[in-house]
Amino acid sequence: MAIQVLPPQLANQIAAGEVVERPASVVKELVENSLDAGATRIDIDIEKGGAKLIRIRDNGCGIAKDELAMALARHATSKITSLDDLEAIISLGFRGEALASISSVSRLTLTSRTEAQTEAWQAYAEGRDQAVTVKPAAHPVGTTLEVLDLFYNTPARRKFMRTEKTEFTHIDEIIRRIALVRFDVAISLTHNGKLVRQYRAVSDDGQRERRLGAICGTAFLSHALKIDWQHGELSLHGWVADPSGSKALSELQYCYVNGRMMRDRLINHAIRQAYEDKLGDRHQPAYVLYLEIDPHQVDVNVHPAKHEVRFHQSRLVHDFIYQGVVSVLQESGAETLPEIATAQPAERWQPENRQAAGGNHFATPAPAAAPRPASTASSSWQRQEPVYQKREGAAYQQLLQTPTRSEEPPLSPASVTQNDAPALSAHAQSFGRVLTIVREQYALLEGKKGLALLALTVAERWLKQAQLEPGSEGLRPQPLLIPVRLKLDKAERDAGNRCSELLNQMGIDLKFDAHHVMLRAVPLPLRQQNLQNLIPEMLGYLAQHQDVTAFQLAQWFARQSASEHQHWNHSQAITLLAEVERLCPTLVKSPPSGLLQNVDIEMAMNALKHE
């Protein structure tokens, strides 16, 4: 078959396959055109779920007579004129495809009048070449679009339309979403001659909340927490439901970027992460949020239906949204779940060969840290030292040949040498080869002295303590993309001011003003922690203890920091041990109590022998 240019109607129908998914898609495109035209009132009439009639009437600026035919042509628009405009889009529409695509799969009539005209004009396209006919009509200033018999000429598409009730439900949802972002526009929705929705234009905050309640329900309004978060050219405002409200309203999620309705994965992930220790995995947060960003920093031309965007600084936007939502939840006093057990995906098998020590696992993005149990500041200062539990069971105890100990003494420099753990020879370079992971928390090692069991969480704590010891030059502060605003009491603020030199040595940058404390930088090992909980607890610890040294503070951080792995796998254990061997050679030569335990395999083998 020879290459040829497609006829206009066929080309438009192909484009309609992306733009016009169902009647609700038509309503969305046409209402957005009305909003771009500056309309303050929009009336939507629907018949038979949109299959028979979709009529959109507005009081916008209208379309001039000599532009009506062009309005129904492909790639014709008044919203952008150059590539620079495309890179900073502020209108809802910009491609110039909607009207041409819709007219190719329906009988579309466009009637419009501008304020400068004394009469209105009507245009419609017909035939294979989509020729446009223009004739006089009666109409006030504004535009009316009628879409009759949607998909009449594409039976396959019409066959896949759902019931009238289902299609209208989708249309109703589109109108709800638009009404939530354009409070200044009056909107009415009629179905089969019956008025279904009517939203009056509102201006003040009280009226906005009434419209919010009318759309989202009084249940959401009663649990709504208002958010107003600003950083540079980023702005986040709207409402989020408290955890108890979110559990009952998990399907209520509305998000907008520069006034455009979105279903963006990055935004949803940031919001879900903010609720992670409040809701767990079984519930979804409920929210109505509006993100304002410099149009040059976001690309909206990445999705056929414009449901997704691409941020040029995605990590900055993610952290900004996360910090904003976390702050309002903390200020409201929302309770944290006591403990969250998250199921981890099955890990792929990794080869047993150890990579050379020297690779720093902090240099690669770390998995999300397991949430720590919530605690008040006062209780956290008096928290008991971590208790490392060994697995119970007769077979396990026989294998280890040691009595089970329920507690480990506090970490101290002396504990590295004063213990009854097996001492390795002075020339030992490693713990040995990782054979397997036992019960997701221990590594079974094979070394020169035989088999040994190593507690991975204990090794991780020792490593973190070594990484947090500042030395003579201090730790390098790592600036946060979004400074964290902390809520501190007087004792914590006083401790921060008193220990400013120690905090600088630890790489922690705090800025105090009259009302707030901003955390601007932390050392690299703390970047993955929940800083809004950890730093206030640290200041509380300093308030309760005088003359704390950098070593003691590093030890405290190592104990209080959440583990980066709730369930360890083979490759993670290898990476951890390589770092421990590089940074903590003393642990290899003389492991402290609770870190390493020899396994007497001979006894187990003898028990299996038969005479």
Curated annotation (Swiss-Prot):
Keywords: DNA damage, DNA repair
Compositional bias ranges of the Low complexity kind: 363-380
InterPro entries recorded: DNA_mismatch_repair_CS (IPR014762), DNA_mismatch_repair_MutL (IPR020667), DNA_mismatch_S5_2-like (IPR013507), HATPase_C_sf (IPR036890), MutL/Mlh/PMS (IPR002099), MutL/Mlh/Pms-like (IPR038973), MutL_C (IPR014790), MutL_C_dimsub (IPR042120)
GO biological process: mismatch repair
GO terms under cellular component: mismatch repair complex
Pfam family, one: HATPase_c_3
Disordered, as annotated region: 353-387
GO molecular function, one term: ATP-dependent DNA damage sensor activity
Entries under SUPFAM superfamilies matching the protein: ATPase domain of HSP90 chaperone/DNA topoisomerase II/histidine kinase, DNA mismatch repair protein MutL, Ribosomal protein S5 domain 2-like
Superkingdom of origin: Bacteria
Family that this chain belongs to: Belongs to the DNA mismatch repair MutL/HexB family.
UniProt function note: This protein is involved in the repair of mismatches in DNA. It is required for dam-dependent methyl-directed DNA mismatch repair. May act as a 'molecular matchmaker', a protein that promotes the formation of a stable complex between two or more DNA-binding proteins in an ATP-dependent manner without itself being part of a final effector complex.
Name of the molecule in the record: DNA mismatch repair protein MutL
Originating species: Erwinia tasmaniensis (strain DSM 17950 / CFBP 7177 / CIP 109463 / NCPPB 4357 / Et1/99)
Gene: mutL
